Amino acid sequence: MHNLTIAEIIQGLKNKSFSSVEITQHFLNRIKTLDTEYNSFITLTEEQALAQATAADARLAAGDAPALCGVPLAHKDIFCTNGVRTSCGSKMLDNFVPPYDATVVTNYSQDGVVILGKTNMDEFAMGSSNETSYYGPVKNPWDTNCVPGGSSGGSAAAVAARLVPGATATDTGGSIRQPAALCGITGIKPTYGRVSRWGMIAFASSLDQAGTMTRTAEDAALMLQSMASYDRKDSTCVDHPIDDYSVNLNAPLAGLKIGIPKEYFGEGLNPGTAEAVQAAIKTYEAMGATVQEVSLPHTHLAVPAYYVIAPAECSANLSRFDGVRYGHRCDNPKDLEDLYRRSRGEGFGEEVKRRILVGTYALSAGFYDAYYRKAQQVRRLIKQDFVDVFSQVDVILGPTSPSPAFEFGSKGSDPVAMYLEDIYTIATNLAGLPGMSIPCGQVDGKPVGLQLIGNYFAEAKLLNIAHKFQTETDFHTQAPAAIK
């Protein structure tokens, strides 16, 4: 049953081939048996999941159930879950049990989704390898000596290992698309504001966006349909009509205009990755799309601008974790300053501390104009690059990551090398655009991701373009050798 897609599970539940309790128990048993190898889950909610599955079966029997009712999924451990620990991968929140659900969690609960547990992640979503988690690194199911990508590495590995058919995730600079690429699955980051951030623990508020991880674009459409909503509790959520993401999945691509940014095929791109992406582009041409080279001239400034803006926002957001109201609290503080210093020093990991310090420096009185203001000006130029390109083409294609999965520890001593893993994904977040990654090949037995970038609120078009590729190829059906 674990090889079934979400769409197939929905059909199986409808046909009574199995019950929600049966398939939920199957995945729970699989997680308990196999996840000692991958470490993709922080918390398993077995008792709650079986209760939800029982309720879903009753709802299905009554004949009035939403599409995802009874389907088992998992949440990245950044979404607040009422009564269930939400750690954000950090010692700081190791004992935090929220008294409420995030809007994303509520949306899925209302649709009768069964939640198997909370997935591992880089601490406070800061990382590109899932090596910064307080709960230990997640291993890539394709090669357990390699990272799964980050920060949503737990969700990506769990989906790739068939421990769960789909999972929620978040993307601040590539944290859905990059691990999706490295684990050979489908990941979508919607337009900024398409999905509520309420109850999603903040890293960089102007960049964070929730999305999904699945094996297919068809499944991504089903998950996004439930996730997307307008929410008054999130002031950045946009009141924009929500498309039916499944209805046009099979629309023909004849006449589709594809832009290929020349800046995405320069120095640093693995030759095998480039070859796989170029082959994918030829597949689209065979389906009737036209391809033209385009330019995003400020691409080289995306990483430096991001690593001023994101740490600055992180510095402000993480100031709330002071050991007073919730989160880690040091023992026997001498005074208030000692409480702050030791609680934060003990609660945060090295990468989080690094970004807080960088952000605080960038926001300080003497450097605000030189760094933060300048980075925001660059952000505006990057956004204009995309506006200009989308006046010529319908979608942008390129590599998701410069290389396939790398070995643990190979980039940890060089933060800049790690940051450059997101060189092709960061600009999309700075501009607030939707982006996807779908598998398009392999290099040395490890997956390669093709990135699709769309115009604002063009998620339905991206899903159509991704689905059509998956009807012509079988990369999305391939599984790691160890998966049975």
From Swiss-Prot:
Gene3D superfamilies in alphabetical order: Amidase signature (AS) domain (3.90.1300.10)
GO biological process terms held by the UniProt record: translation
Reactions listed under catalytic activity: L-glutamyl-tRNA(Gln) + L-glutamine + ATP + H2O = L-glutaminyl-tRNA(Gln) + L-glutamate + ADP + phosphate + H(+)
Any one GO MF annotation of this record: ATP binding
Gene Ontology cellular-component terms listed: glutamyl-tRNA(Gln) amidotransferase complex
Keywords of this entry: ATP-binding, Ligase, Nucleotide-binding, Protein biosynthesis
Documented EC number(s): 6.3.5.7
Disulphide-bonded residues: none
InterPro entries given in the database record: Amidase, Amidase_CS, Amidase_dom, AS_sf, GatA
Stored Pfam families: Amidase
Membrane-spanning intervals of the chain: none
PROSITE patterns: AMIDASES
Active site location: K76, S151, S175
Stated role: Allows the formation of correctly charged Gln-tRNA(Gln) through the transamidation of misacylated Glu-tRNA(Gln) in organisms which lack glutaminyl-tRNA synthetase. The reaction takes place in the presence of glutamine and ATP through an activated gamma-phospho-Glu-tRNA(Gln).
Family: Belongs to the amidase family. GatA subfamily.
Subunit structure and binding partners: Heterotrimer of A, B and C subunits.
Protein name: Glutamyl-tRNA(Gln) amidotransferase subunit A
Organism: Saccharophagus degradans (strain 2-40 / ATCC 43961 / DSM 17024)
Species classification: Bacteria, Pseudomonadati, Pseudomonadota, Gammaproteobacteria, Cellvibrionales
